[in-house]
UniProtKB/Swiss-Prot annotation:
The keyword Metal-binding applies. It comes from Methanosarcina mazei (strain ATCC BAA-159 / DSM 3647 / Goe1 / Go1 / JCM 11833 / OCM 88) (Methanosarcina frisia). This is Methylcobamide:CoM methyltransferase MtbA. Belongs to the uroporphyrinogen decarboxylase family. MtbA/MtaA subfamily. It comes from the Archaea. The lineage of its organism: Archaea, Methanobacteriati, Methanobacteriota, Stenosarchaea group, Methanomicrobia.
Length: 339
């Protein structure tokens, strides 16, 4: 069989086309302290500096061996753009949302005039361009963003779930706003060189909101993003935390190319629950990759591969203290696998 470039290989694998072997990629957060030390680009500065962000993302390829480059390393830049307060994090901890900006429709109107060129959103787009110009012909460039449901929760805060249950007008209005922003942001990423979009929507977990609420408040808005990317021939990967086994069939209706599942999902069951998307995952980021040994990683990888995973990767974002040797072993296992 033809030997493909990493870019060609992932393009084909995400579209269920024959490939020479499994891609070795990560669709979730890739930054670790060891990569920071190797690259000289450290958190939290790398969250807000395009050159440092690109340099740390590059380390995922040059240090670990991932056959793709991916930015950013957190899911708070979007909320920050819309006036939310952010705790910057540190060398080991990612940024987090600590203050919310929209309580009602009047507040929502105040954040509608935004620019993608400002703040950390602009920084991320610059980092995508830097990476694309250096690696885009050979490697996939993955642009990641928080999904519309989780972004709405970040913006609306603790009131969000109460508003869902009482059917407040702010809910569909904010979800429409977030999905439209996601589409504009994803298109800007593509314009700057991204060829794959990862949608990280943790608060939309089936474990948290159930099938009825997912179908009403998450599915249509995620699907809008996916449909917009399909028009550009850009693959999409949806990651939602928790045991999403019983929700996979609904998630599959978004039309995404791949669904990323965490370590609590049984891969064999998961692959039987979807018709269109491939299942990617789902090594335990804590017990196996952070606290385990390369031998543990190899054993866990074999189990996941034998269960029929579409692409072997991490079950959630990589813990910043994860040893490079463990990630390198995961990459090796993926590269050695033939479908």
């Amino acid at each position: 069989m033809t030997e493909y470039t990493p870019k060609e290989r992932l393009y084909r694998a995400l579209r269920k086309q024959p490939v020479d072997r499994m891609p070795a990629v990560c669709f979730t957060q890739t930054g670790t302290v060891e990569q920071m030390e190797a690259s000289g680009a450290f958190w939290p500065e790398a969250h807000a500096d395009a050159e440092k962000m690109a340099k740390l993302a590059e380390a995922g390829h040059t240090v670990i061996g991932f056959e793709a480059v991916r930015v950013p390393f957190d899911i708070t830049a979007e909320a920050e753009l819309f006036g939310c307060g952010i705790k910057a994090g540190d060398l080991k901890q990612q940024p987090s949302v600590i203050k919310h900006s929209v309580k009602n429709l009047e507040d929502l109107d105040k954040i509608k005039n935004y620019s993608l060129d400002t703040g950390r959103i602009g920084t991320i787009l610059k980092a995508v361009k830097i990476l694309s110009e250096k690696y885009g012909k050979e490697l996939p460039v993955i642009g990641s963003m928080i999904g519309p449901f989780s972004l709405a929760q970040h913006i609306n805060g603790d009131a969000w779930f109460g508003n869902l249950f009482t059917g407040e007008d702010i809910v569909p209005a904010l979800l429409d706003f977030c999905a439209d922003f996601n589409i504009a942001y994803a298109k800007a990423m593509v314009e700057n060189g991204a060829d794959t979009i990862a949608i990280i929507d943790p608060t939309a977990s089936y474990e948290l909101i159930g099938g009825e609420f997912y179908e009403k408040y998450a599915l249509p808005y995620q699907k809008k993003i996916v449909d917009a990317m399909k028009e550009l021939d850009v693959a999409t990967v949806l990651h939602i935390c928790g045991n999403t086994t019983n929700g996979l069939a609904i998630m599959d209706r978004t039309g995404v190319n791949a669904i990323s599942v965490d370590q609590r999902v049984d891969i064999k069951t998961a692959t039987g629950n979807v018709e269109n998307a491939i299942i990617v995952g789902n090594l335990d980021p804590v017990a196996v990759l952070w606290n385990g040994t390369p031998e543990d990683v190899e054993a866990a990888s074999k189990k996941v591969l034998d269960a029929g995973v579409g692409i072997l990767t991490v079950g959630c974002g990589i813990v910043s203290m994860t040893p490079s040797a463990n990630l390198q072993k995961m990459v090796e296992c993926a590269k050695n696998y033939r479908y």
